[in-house]
């Protein structure tokens, strides 16, 4: 998957970030399209055998205009991964297939700090849909807000401890890529219930 272009959310001029972040916006939908096209081309030069099918919005922010542009201009992007539980302006999702056919595959938790709220969210989602969806930035260990001050050993130990708990609590979970999990969401979304009373 891809995680935006220069970590800039796909948001047009005038998008309200509620004063929480200081991101630039895109002047036009065509500018957003050109940036993602450049990112897709660059990614294909690095990973020519891989198909990019997942878009993870930077800072979990995705405007309606940005989402529409992705759906219209990049048919290979079949999955969007925002968040299941939002705080402010984030792209909030359920596990489902949208009317335009794009699979909504939210993350439940992220990073390796794994505070009590994240553990609560993970526990609840295991009980609700028996899913663990976890996102890690490669640069988490370098970012103060995401744990760099704790150090690599602490972050690694946190993540190891979480994985030990997860596999102990939910041994039936399947390890899947976003593309594989997207197909599972498609199957889940198609489920129906029929009953016959006699």
Feature names for model-found ranges:
Residues 44-47, 72-95, 136-198:
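C-terminal domain-boundary segment and adjacent tail
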Residues 1-5, 9, 94-98, 121-128:
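Acidic (Asp/Glu)-rich catalytic clusters
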Residues 11-13, 116, 144-147:
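Short conserved micro-motifs at the rims of enzyme active sites and ligand-binding pockets
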Residues 102-114:
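Catalytic-face loop-and-helix region of soluble metabolic enzyme cores
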Residues 1-2, 53-57, 78-82, 104, ...:
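Structural recognition of the beta-strand scaffold that forms the well-ordered cores
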Residues 1-65, 138:
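Metal-dependent polysaccharide deacetylase catalytic core of the NodB/CE4 family, i.e.
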Residues 86-94, 112-123:
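Alpha-helical scaffolding within the catalytic cores
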Residues 66-70:
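A short acidic, amphipathic alpha-helical/loop segment
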């Amino acid at each position: 998957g891809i995680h935006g272009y220069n970590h800039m959310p796909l948001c047009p001029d005038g998008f309200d970030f509620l004063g929480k972040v200081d991101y630039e916006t895109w002047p036009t939908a065509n500018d957003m399209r050109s940036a993602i096209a450049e990112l897709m081309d660059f990614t294909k030069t690095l990973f020519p055998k891989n198909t990019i099918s997942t878009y993870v919005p930077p800072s979990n922010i995705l405007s309606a205009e940005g989402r529409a542009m992705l759906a219209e201009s990049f048919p290979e992007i079949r999955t969007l991964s925002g968040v299941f539980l939002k705080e402010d302006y984030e792209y909030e999702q359920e596990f489902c297939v949208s009317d335009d056919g794009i699979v909504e595959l939210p993350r439940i938790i992220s990073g390796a700090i794994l505070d009590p709220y994240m553990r609560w969210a993970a526990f609840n989602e295991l009980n609700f849909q028996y899913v663990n969806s976890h996102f890690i930035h490669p640069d988490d260990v370098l970012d103060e807000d995401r744990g760099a001050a704790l150090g690599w050993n602490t972050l690694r130990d946190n993540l190891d401890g979480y994985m030990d708990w997860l596999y102990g609590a939910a041994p039936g979970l399947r390890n899947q890529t976003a593309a594989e999990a997207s197909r599972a969401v498609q199957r889940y979304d198609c489920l129906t219930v029929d009953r016959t009373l006699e």
